[in-house]
Amino acid sequence: EFLSAYDQGFARVAAVTLPVVPVDPAANAAAIIEQARALAEDGVCLAAFPELCLTGYAIDDLLLSDVLLSDVLAAIETLRAASADLLPALVVGAPLRLGDRLYNCALVIQGGRVRGVAPKSYLPTYREFYEKRHFAPGDALPAGVESIELPGVRSGSDGAERTESADGSGDTEPVARVPFGANLLFEVEDVPGLTFHVEVCEDMWVPVPPSSLAALAGATVLVNLSGSPITVGRAEDRELLARSSSARGLAAYVYAAAGQGESSTDLAWDGQTLVYENGELLGTTERFPDGPRATVVDVDIEGLRAERLRQGTFADNARTLSSPVAGGPAPATTFTDPAAFRRIRISAADLAAPRTDIGLRRRVDRFPFVPDDPARLAQDCYEAYNIQVAALVQRLGAIGNPKIVIGVSGGLDSTHALIVAARAMDRLGRPRSDIHAITMPGFATSAGTRRNAEDLAVGLGCTFEELDIRATATQMLTEMGHPYGEYARTGVLPEGASERELYDVTFENVQAGLRTDFLFRIANHRGGIVLGTGDLSELALGWCTFGVGDQMAHYGVNAGIPKTLIQHLIRWVVAEELFDDAVGRTLLSILDTEISPELVPAEAGGAIQSTQAKIGPYALQDFT
């Protein structure tokens, strides 16, 4: 289905925070189910809730209560039963007993089954945290432990389950046996590429988080259930860690923190939720909310997989960690070896993603190369401009500091290349007169662009010259038998010729080719290099004259800059006052000029030739 986000490689996920009732698993399970039903209606296939959300995080020694732990199992069974007719895989937090140890766990519940349980690996016991008072670390499970039994919880029709007498009375109850460990990967068959891993709060804060290895093992979505009481500045720390994890892991990072309802005896809670994808924030909710909140976004699973293919070092890292170190032992645990992860398959029969038009829940930038945030845009412009300047400085120094020969038209690209060249000369301590700025009027050059070209070159202190190409172009067109040759001689269209034939692609390319030819010969004569002006948008579209034309130069400073960004770069140069006021006024005049190759004359009173009328808006071209 073309309009289905899932069929286009996306997966809808949610990070949820909601009010908890401390020490009341039944009430909390009911609240989770209510949210899960709403998320199912929204097409969500994976929903993460906060750490210990079935009991509340800040309940201290009540975590060790047998009554509470029994109520937790009953609440898990309630969630399991409710999940049978719900779409999303639910990831919820709860304390679970294994033998004589208690673990801080994340349970994955979906399709009427508890799919797996991931214990928290790293327990903070510093400052306001003292989790080792209650819990055992999940990175040190007893030898051979790979599953956990959940008394009173059913496994579903195809799960491992037995019955036992809970109190010796002879009455029996179901006991589900489910995978247990921090090395679980959950593969969603109906969403190609969606494999998720779960870690808990502090696991994100250690130098080598379990999620990093999970990503190397194939997880594309990394889930973190968090308690994380709020202190001043901690929200920024979470964002930094989630962003970093998603960027290094080439994955999505889904983060849900505890909020309303948690005890404020000595702690406070903000209920922050975040989803990052490959270092970019997809969504977040307000902090300190009144009531439940969910960050619901569509993760580009297909894009993440493609990025991993492009970045070969990602697979190299997984291979290195999975291989023995020379002279040392082979990796032995999940925490050193991505290959040690276990995969749990969620079949298409159990989780069938909607194949209907559910819209797209992610922000799509209209201008992908131009940030909306003014501060970020200014930073990008600063970096882009100085990258160009530094690169040109290096190139000039490496080839003996030749002069620069550049064709200036009064358009955006040649303007930007010229102000890059001017700054490069300043950095090198050379006079700007070593820049030979040559304008070459053709058959359609307007007075405005001709004036802007001269004002800019002279204002910058360049060596400015005019070389009119019309006579040479006319001679070439005449000698090759082009209709324009006879028209130029007689002023009358040749018999049978149309104006379209007169101003055809040959007419245009003769002018473009002559300009480039002159520039190269002038550079030869004066000991210079031709500085190319074509931008990334033109190169991507092939919107240039190939061979002897504007496709060719000795060095192209604009080749990595899209057209939509060049306009902002020039505005940034004006705003930063890098040049004097007269140059600034000329730059603003150039920005107000229609983008045109000026190769075909306008009819009397008609509009000038427009590039965007021919190839479409650059805003659209740069977007695609």
Regions found by a protein language model. Give the residues of each.
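Enzyme catalytic cores with a strong preference for nitrogen-chemistry domains
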Residues: 1-405, 423-432, 464
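ATP/NTP-dependent adenylation/nucleotidyl-transfer catalytic domains that generate, transfer
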Residues: 28, 161-166, 192-195, 249-251, ...
